[in-house]
Amino acid sequence: MIYRISHTTTYDYTDSISLSHHLLRLSPRNLPHQRCLHHEVHIDPQPAIAERHVDYFGNAVTFLTIEGAHKKLVVKSESNVSLMPPAVPASAETPAWENVRESGRGRQMGHSLEGSEFVFDSPLVRTTDDFAAYAAPSFPKNRPILEAALDLTKRIHADFKFDPKATTLATPLEEVFKNRRGVCQDFAQFEIACFRSLGLPARYVSGYLETDPPPGKPRFVGADASHAWVSFYCHGIGWIDVDPTNNVLPGTRHIAVAYGRDYNDVTPIRGVILGAGEHTLKVAVDVVEMKEPAKAGAAKSVPKRPSS
């Protein structure tokens, strides 16, 4: 399957901004089952500096500097991505979760080094006894780790209610756990906290989810949104993704953009500005399946001025 993704972010400032610096993490990753065929970013006003690099976690990052007075900033990311079904083992073929935990603790780590750094606390995800206790019923002795992960994912989906008004980016996980409400970011970070509280490595995945309109209803541009899910590490197999918001194993409708310890590592756009006043933020994400194959080529990330 091939998708066209449009992600437009608009900042409107009440007062003029004289200088701003921004980091963008908007380019879909290249993975065994996912290929970014094309990517470009349109910026208005035109940046004085636009440089691209790869961060510690392997995410494509674009650094921007906007000079000159401006009261609006528009960042439009456009991508074409090809997806195949990811290879996921049968639950019974995965090792017992205790073996995964011990593989990251022993001196024989070797191949487990990739996951070991995702066992520890991070700025937005803290391990606690309460989180471990919540996860425990899904992780009885000798249960295959994928079977346990799917059960935990199912329970979070059932126990927590999707409520965009319940949390902000600053809401602590303890409050999310207490109220059992939030959005995909909260559910992903809570499940990561559960894994890590049991000594299991897990990371945050940001990306997009293709969603279908209700039967008989038109598809609205911007109806889709950026999405978040979880990836846990299993020695001998690698990373396996689960989506607690939708209670699914991510497949050909999940498009990965960035990996990190938590949301702080994968923020789509962040930056600093020189100026006073307030600002409003508008975000529109559109994910459309393409009926005709897109022309394959090297993915690029080139800042451009919008034509409209």
Predicted regions mapped to residue ranges:
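Short beta-strand segments enriched in hydrophobic/aromatic residues
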Residues: Y13, V81, C234, V287-E289
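Linear, non-domain "peripheral" regions
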Residues: M1-A133, P137, N142
